[in-house]
Amino acid sequence: IGKTAIVEGLAYRIKNNMVPNALFGYDLYKLNVTSLMGDYNVAGQSESRVDLLVKELASRQKTIVFIDETHLLVKGSSTASGMDFANMFKAGLDRGEIKMIGATTTEEYEQYILRDRAFLRRFQKVDVVEADRETTIKILMGTYPKLEKQIGVKLNYTDFIKEKIMAFIVDMTDEYKRVYEIASRYPDICLTILSNAFTYALFENSREVKMRHIYQAIANCKNVYEDSKKKDMARFKVEFADILREENTNLDEVI
C-alpha cells in the first residue's frame, strides 16, 4: 500500500533539500534483495555478494539503502541452506555504519522478522496504514500525469471532471471490495484500475482515455461473468451522469 512510494518521496525531499540538516547530502539506493541473494543453493556466492555489499555500505558516510521485502533477509536462515543474511548486517547497523530502510507486509513481518529479535531491535517499526478515500483520490490525481507521459494517452477533461472520475473509481472500488471481498487495499487497487484504463485506450489506438475505458477497468477488477461486467458498465454510466448533474455540470458528452 505504497511502501516504495514513501521512500521515493523521501528521496525527492532529500534531492530538493526538504529534509532536516542531518539528512542533507544523502544518497538513497534501492536494493533488489532477490537478485543479491540469488540461488540459495549457491551459498558461497550469495554470502560473498552480501559481504561485499555490507562492506561497501559501511564505507559510505552518507548513504541510505532501501530494501523492499526485508523479510527475505531473515527468511534465508529458515531455508535448507541455513544462510543468515540478516546476521551479516547486524554489526554494521549496530555501529551506525549502515543506514537502512526496510519494508515488508504485516504478514511477512509477523512470520519472519518477529522471530529474529536481534535483527528487529535495530529498526524503528513504522506501520503504513491503508489510505482513506480522500488520500486515495489525491494519489490518483497525482498519478495520472505520469501515466499520460508513460503511455502516451491523455485524460483530456477539466480538473473538476478529473477529480470526479477519481472519486468515482474509489467509490465503485469500495463497493466491489465490500460485496466481493476483494483483498487488495487502497491505493493499490485504484492505481491498477487507472493504469488499466489508460492501457485500454492505448489498445484501441485512442489518444484519449474515455469514460468507457474507466468503466471497463472498474468492471474488470472483479472476477465475474462478462454479462455481469456489461451490466455494471451500463450502471456506472448512469451513476456518473447523475453525479455530474448533481453538480450542475452540463457535460453529458463526458459520460
Question: What spans do the regions from the language model cover?
Answer:
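AAA+ P-loop NTPase nucleotide-binding core of proteostasis motors
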Residues: 1-255
